[in-house]
Amino acid sequence: MAKGVLIAAGGTGGHIFPALAVAGELRARGVRVDWIGTSQGMEQRLVPAAGFPLHALEMQGLRGKGWRRWLSAPWRLARAVLQARRILRSCGAEAVLGMGGYVSAPAGLAAWSLGRRLCLHEQNAIPGLANRLLAPLAKAVFTGFPDTGLPKAQWVGNPVRAAIAELPAPALRFAGRAGEPAHLLIMGGSQGAQVINTLVVAAVAALPAAARPEIWHQCGSAHLENTQAAYAAAGVAARVEAFIDDMAAALAWADLAICRAGAATVAELCAAGLGSLLIPFPFAVDDHQAANARFIEDTGAGRMLRQEGLEATQLTAMLHALLPDRGLQLRWAEAARRQARTDAAQVVASACQGEAHA
């Protein structure tokens, strides 16, 4: 049984929040958890706040970078692997959990080179480069979506925070809301999305005043003042926050969500049981957000809207039809809940410990 686990996850909430769910499960079992991440990502705030020691690697991703960065990649990777080996030795972890993203590659190679147990979790429907390269070296490979094509992969879903997994069923949450304005949750991912911010304000402003929903909007820290000003100028009341810390409360409150289609977001929508209009980030690597959104649409839990060509008038028409339709909101929410795999954190934690999950 592993006495300590080193988790490799960084950059954005899509990697960090599922990793935090596993870290919390391991800590509850009495396992020491260390974290290896980047020096610039959200983990710098979220991981210490959760009480886990954070070690930063000096490494940056390669996708979308110039040819000079690619030419220097072997040297940069070798240096990062040596760094990761030192961190792994110093913290004494016997297993490494790679959650994808470029920080996972050196951490995974360090684990393999030192003979430590390597486990991987791929959050997206289309696997990222790091997990594709590391999968043959891993003892266990887990995925958030079925049919990813990774060798040895077991579909367990994406780990979600316990507070979200434990929310009441949609029918219980929605009971008694008939006759009230619909509750619309807007999320542009952990860092916000200006396109979604702009679209939603314009779309809601065009609705008749009596048809407008109550709004809770996560807009990203870079867009907070502009988004608040846009709602005020449009005469639309809204609760606007840079980042929603209590996501379980937001999901419990909502009747419908408009959001990006990152893997962590999709997993949390399913765990909570909440229907959605998903607008995939069009520049995501391998267009993986579109694949994530297609899963939701195909299972009857929402609709995918392509950002290209999407106009506020189209969104207004959709909202005009969706917001008063309590029956459809419940059907979408229940379909989402049926896709939930709420034991993912337990399964992955057991694998990190070298156990089979009962």
Question: Predicted segment positions?
Answer:
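C-terminal alpha-helical cap of glycosyltransferases
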Residues: 341-358
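Acidic donor-binding loop of glycosyltransferase active sites
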Residues: 93-94, 252-266, 274-275
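Donor-nucleotide binding loops and adjacent catalytic segments primarily
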Residues: 41, 46, 50, 169-257, ...
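Short amphipathic alpha-helix
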Residues: 15-26
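Active-site-proximal region of nucleotide-activated glycan assembly enzymes
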Residues: 32, 42, 53, 112-170
